[in-house]
Amino acid sequence: MIKSKFIVIEGLEGSGKTNAISKIVNLLNKQGIKNVIFTREPGGTPLAESLRTLIKEGVGYEKITDNAELLMIYAARIQLVESVIKPALENGSWVVGDRHDLSSLAYQGGGRKIDTKILKMLREVFLRDFYPDLTFYLDIPPIMGLARIRARATVRAQIRDKVNKIKRNHSHDIKNALDRIEVEPISFFDRTRKKYKELASKNEKIITIDASKSLELVNKEIKHQLLKWLKKQI
């Protein structure tokens, strides 16, 4: 019996994390690993979900500073790790997470250009030697990922208006359907992706998946890599 593990899925907006998580949980179940819980960052606990709303939506017209954003993300992360993830692992459950601290290194370190020393200090103080056992990084060009996000936002607006029997142009609704991270300029996501790729290339526990390929090929590669990794854990 394989000891409980913490598997994380990382990637830019529109990279297909939701699909990957579903695929991984399904594959684990087929391998006889039934006790699997799902978490997401920021979020996963009542407090962390409240922080997620603040991070994603902000408060009125007040600008959230980069450092304030980072600290809110870390507060949510610490709450999730200490109250959900660690207890689950100790009780024998596997945990599949939508993002972990690699996101902070990429988004806040790369995208926001926050000093890496600050990010490392936060990890060392609060997470210490707690790391995911395996991370899948879904790599996708920002322009492709954002196109997927905007397409989904358009569909949601169309469905909503169909239900409410409203006819209108949805060009103005798309931006309103995106959160404060998703409306960042393409240069922000270029920097974030560059940092992701840099970090992934230096860590053997991070597997890079080309998420620009078809869903079928992405799922096939995830299956191949996950099963190969599981064999090494026996």
Curated annotation (Swiss-Prot):
Task: Report the source organism.
Answer: Wigglesworthia glossinidia brevipalpis
Which InterPro entries would you find in this protein's record? P-loop_NTPase (IPR027417), Thymidylate_kin-like_dom (IPR039430), Thymidylate_kin_CS (IPR018095), Thymidylate_kinase (IPR018094)
Q: Name one GO cellular component term.
A: cytosol
Q: What class of enzyme is it?
A: transferase
This protein's UniProt keywords: ATP-binding, Kinase, Nucleotide biosynthesis, Nucleotide-binding, Transferase
Protein's name in the database: Thymidylate kinase
The entry's family comment says:
Belongs to the thymidylate kinase family.
Function, as annotated: Phosphorylation of dTMP to form dTDP in both de novo and salvage pathways of dTTP synthesis.
Q: Does the keyword Transferase apply?
A: yes
What EC number(s) does its UniProt record assign?
2.7.4.9
* Reactions listed under catalytic activity: dTMP + ATP = dTDP + ADP
Q: Does the keyword Disulfide bond apply?
A: no
Q: Pfam families from the xrefs?
A: Thymidylate_kin (PF02223)
Q: Name one GO biological process term.
A: dTTP biosynthetic process
> Where does the chain bind ATP?
11-18
Q: Name one GO molecular function term.
A: ATP binding
Q: Which residues form a coiled coil?
A: none
The family database entries (Gene3D superfamilies) matched by this protein are listed as: P-loop containing nucleotide triphosphate hydrolases
Tell me which HAMAP family the record gives.
Answer: Thymidylate_kinase
